[in-house]
């Protein structure tokens, strides 16, 4: 795993899960995904979540991001208990505090790269001018300054994913949640996008929580947690 230490100047968890439980029901059949799961992600920390297919990695990420609700336990984001917030307040907290990157970029096809990255800033209530300046700066940071006015269909797979990284950072979030963000890319492009995320983590002190099946990428992060039998266990360097 990465030998750089977790930043000491930034204290306190940006995300905390306490005794988290999640059960799905299908007719009379109950499927328990988590039971009593605990997790803390500190500010500026990078965390990989690994585990077998079907273990619930994506479900956990959705719970941490307030996109789904737990059956038991609580999730706190920036110190706020998600279950105590209205849908509107939860959405505003997500937009301000969290960024999301998925395996597929989810860029809106009818808008340019610049417009896609501007949207979270506009939704936060900032002016068009501010949103444009922020989006342009981020797209230049991910080496897409020459592709601002291109729509997703005019970008390569790697370029689309880099635009998605820029969009995730649009509101300077405390934490970015990534669900296999490089899983749909070839090895070379995946490595480029991953290194970009780490560079932005170092520059902006944004925490990263990445679900990945790639143990090589996981080793580059501060901690590697394995989702196993409904809970999380931290892996040693030898186990990764």
From Swiss-Prot:
Matching entries from SUPFAM superfamilies are given as: P-loop containing nucleoside triphosphate hydrolases
Query: Pfam families annotated for this entry?
Result: ABC_tran
Tell me which domain of life the UniProt entry assigns to the organism this sequence originates from: Bacteria
Keyword presence, Cell inner membrane: yes
Q: Which intervals hold domain ABC transporter? A: 15-240
Q: Which UniProt keywords apply?
A: ATP-binding, Cell inner membrane, Cell membrane, Membrane, Nucleotide-binding, Translocase, Transport
Q: Does the keyword rRNA-binding apply?
A: no
User: Listed GO cellular component terms?
Assistant: plasma membrane
Residues of the signal peptide: none
Residues recorded as binding ATP, renumbered to this chain, are 51-58
| UniProt GO BP | lipoprotein localization to outer membrane; protein localization to outer membrane
Q: Which membrane topology term applies here?
A: Peripheral membrane protein
Q: Which InterPro entries match?
A: AAA+_ATPase, ABC_transporter-like_ATP-bd, ABC_transporter-like_CS, ABC_transpr_LolD-like, LolD_lipo_ATP-bd, MacB-like_ATP-bd, P-loop_NTPase
> Known EC number(s)?
7.6.2.-
Q: Where in the cell is it found?
A: Cell inner membrane
What GO MF terms are annotated? ATP binding; ATP hydrolysis activity; transmembrane transporter activity
SMART domains tied to this protein: AAA
Q: How does it assemble?
A: The complex is composed of two ATP-binding proteins (LolD) and two transmembrane proteins (LolC and LolE).
> What's the family?
Belongs to the ABC transporter superfamily. Lipoprotein translocase (TC 3.A.1.125) family.
Concerning NCBIfam families, the annotation shows: LolD_lipo_ex (TIGR02211)
Q: What does this protein do?
A: Part of the ABC transporter complex LolCDE involved in the translocation of mature outer membrane-directed lipoproteins, from the inner membrane to the periplasmic chaperone, LolA. Responsible for the formation of the LolA-lipoprotein complex in an ATP-dependent manner.
The entry's protein name is Lipoprotein-releasing system ATP-binding protein LolD
């Amino acid at each position: 795993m990465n030998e750089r230490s977790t930043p000491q100047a930034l204290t306190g968890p940006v995300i905390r899960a306490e005794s988290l439980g999640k059960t799905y029901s299908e007719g009379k059949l109950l499927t328990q995904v988590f039971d009593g799961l605990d997790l803390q992600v500190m500010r500026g920390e990078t965390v990989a979540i690994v585990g077998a297919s079907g273990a619930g990695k994506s479900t956990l990420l959705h719970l941490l991001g307030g996109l789904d609700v737990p059956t038991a336990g609580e999730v706190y984001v920036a110190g706020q208990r998600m279950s105590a917030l209205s849908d509107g307040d939860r959405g505003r907290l997500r937009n301000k505090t969290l960024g999301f990157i998925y395996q597929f970029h989810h860029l809106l096809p009818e808008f340019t790269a610049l417009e896609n990255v501007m949207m979270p800033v506009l939704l936060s209530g900032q002016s068009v001018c501010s949103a444009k300046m922020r989006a342009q700066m981020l797209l230049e940071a991910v080496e897409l300054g020459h592709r601002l006015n291109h729509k997703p269909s005019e970008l390569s797979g790697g370029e689309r994913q880099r635009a998605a990284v820029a969009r995730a950072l649009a509101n300077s979030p405390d934490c970015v949640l990534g669900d296999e963000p490089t899983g749909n890319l070839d090895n070379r492009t995946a490595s480029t996008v991953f290194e970009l995320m780490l560079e932005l983590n170092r520059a902006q002190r944004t925490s990263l929580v990445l679900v990945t099946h790639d143990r090589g990428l996981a080793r580059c992060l501060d901690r590697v947690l394995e989702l196993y039998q409904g809970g999380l266990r931290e892996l040693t360097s030898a186990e990764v």
